[in-house]
Amino acid sequence: MRTYEIMYIVRPNIEEDAKKALVERFNGILASEGSEVLEEKDWGKRRLAYEINDFKEGFYNIVRIKTDNNKSTDEFQRLAKINDDIIRYIVIREDQDK
C-alpha cells in the first residue's frame, strides 16, 4: 500500500460550517474510493507566501492516507480542481522506506 500526503488550502472567507462540511466531504471522497485516512490536521488560517485568486490568507488542511490504487487521489484532484472553495492543493506520495 502507498501512503500519500494531501495538503489543500480553503479560501479564507468561507463560513465555519461550510468549511467543516467541505473537509468532511473531501475526507469522505477519499474513504469511499478505498483509502484509509491515517491522519488529518487542521493548520488553521495562515498567510500565503503570495496571493492566490486575490486571497492573502487561507485555511490549511493536511490529510495522510494509505491506499492500494490512485482512484482516491485522482478523484480528489478532479473535484478539487472544480471546487471554488479550494484555492490550492498538492498530492505527494511518501517514500516507501518509512
Curated annotation (Swiss-Prot):
User: Mind listing the UniProt keywords for this protein, alphabetically?
Assistant: Ribonucleoprotein, Ribosomal protein, RNA-binding, rRNA-binding
Gene Ontology terms, MF aspect = small ribosomal subunit rRNA binding; structural constituent of ribosome
A biological-process GO annotation: translation
* Entries under Pfam families matching the protein: Ribosomal_S6
CDD domains attached to this UniProt entry? bS6
Alphabetical list of InterPro entries matching this protein: Ribosomal_bS6, Ribosomal_bS6_CS, Ribosomal_bS6_sf, Ribosomal_S6_plastid/chlpt, Transl_elong_EF1B/ribsomal_bS6
Q: Looking at the UniProt record for this protein, which Gene Ontology cellular component terms does it annotate, in alphabetical order?
A: cytoplasm; ribonucleoprotein complex; ribosome
Give the record's family classification. Answer: Belongs to the bacterial ribosomal protein bS6 family.
Question: Which PANTHER family does the entry mention?
Answer: MITOCHONDRIAL 28S RIBOSOMAL PROTEIN S6, SMALL RIBOSOMAL SUBUNIT PROTEIN BS6M
Please explain the role this protein plays, according to its UniProt record.
Binds together with bS18 to 16S ribosomal RNA.
What protein am I looking at? Small ribosomal subunit protein bS6
Supply the source organism's classification: Bacteria, Bacillati, Bacillota, Bacilli, Bacillales
Q: Which gene encodes it?
A: rpsF
